[in-house]
Design a protein with these regions (language model features):
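Residue-level recognition of beta-strand microenvironments
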Residues: 7, 37, 43-44, 72, ...
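Gly/Ser-rich catalytic serine loop of serine hydrolases
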Residues: 29-30, 74-76, 90-93
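Acidic, glycine-rich catalytic/binding loops that coordinate metals and/or anionic ligands
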Residues: 3, 25-27, 75, 103-189
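Zn2+-dependent peptidoglycan hydrolase active-site motif and core
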Residues: 17-20, 34-76, 98-99, 103-106
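Surface-exposed, glycine-biased beta-strand/turn segments
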Residues: 1-51, 82, 142, 175, ...
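Short hydrophobic beta/alpha edge segments that flank linear recognition/processing sites
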Residues: 24, 53-56, 81-95, 102
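Residue-level detector of conserved, well-ordered beta-strand and adjacent loop positions
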Residues: 5, 25, 57, 67-70, ...
Length: 189
């Protein structure tokens, strides 16, 4: 487990405004993995801000920010999946020690990244993302099964309505036509 050294909206003496993310103490070179699938954007702020930073634009429109990296392991525009290596922890930018700055934006506004703390804590555990992936597959199967049940019900209703239609209809002209067609085909050969 990574020690949390600064929390969301925490006001430290060296900050001019509340913290917009969560800082996790990490050694330089610790692998950093994306916690969700998305599109990569890179920034290098030099000795300011979050230094080398990876932005992962998630499929739900939110953006995860991984800052103070020592090195990138991805390229601009690349697509990553949950669990993919995106870089290595470092001490770049305005930093008081080696750590990962993690934050989340919705549009242009930072939101509380606390719901994703567990994902960061387990980002280097391959079985964690395999479990998350299998949960999604089960959910998709449940969704598919639910809709197949609905389609089956609608087909049953259609069948009942068709039988009801035939029972109420005078279909003797149809039978007479079929008899004539069969006689023509089989007896006029």
């Amino acid at each position: 487990m990574y020690k949390i050294t600064s929390r969301y909206l925490q006001q430290e003496s060296f900050r001019s405004s509340p913290h917009k993310g969560i800082d996790f103490k990490m050694e330089i070179g610790e692998p950093i993995r994306s916690i969700k699938s998305g599109q990569i954007h890179l920034a290098d702020y030099g000795n300011t801000n979050a230094g080398k930073t990876v932005f992962v634009e998630w499929e739900d429109g939110r953006t995860a920010i991984y800052g103070h990296l020592n090195e990138f392991a991805v390229k601009e525009g690349q697509h990553v999946n949950a669990g993919d290596l995106i870089g290595y922890a470092g001490n770049t930018g305005f930093s008081t020690g080696s750590h990962l700055h993690f934050s989340v934006k919705e549009g242009s506004k930072h939101i509380d990244p606390s719901p994703y703390m567990n994902d960061i804590q387990h980002m280097n555990d391959p079985s964690y993302f395999a479990q998350v992936s299998s949960d999604v597959k089960v959910s998709f199967f449940d969704y598919f099964q639910q809709h197949m049940d609905l389609i089956g019900t609608q087909l049953t209703d259609l069948k009942v309505n068709f039988v009801h239609f035939l029972a109420l209809s005078d279909y003797s002209p149809i039978i007479k036509l079929l008899q004539n067609v069969i006689q023509f085909i089989f007896f006029n050969i």
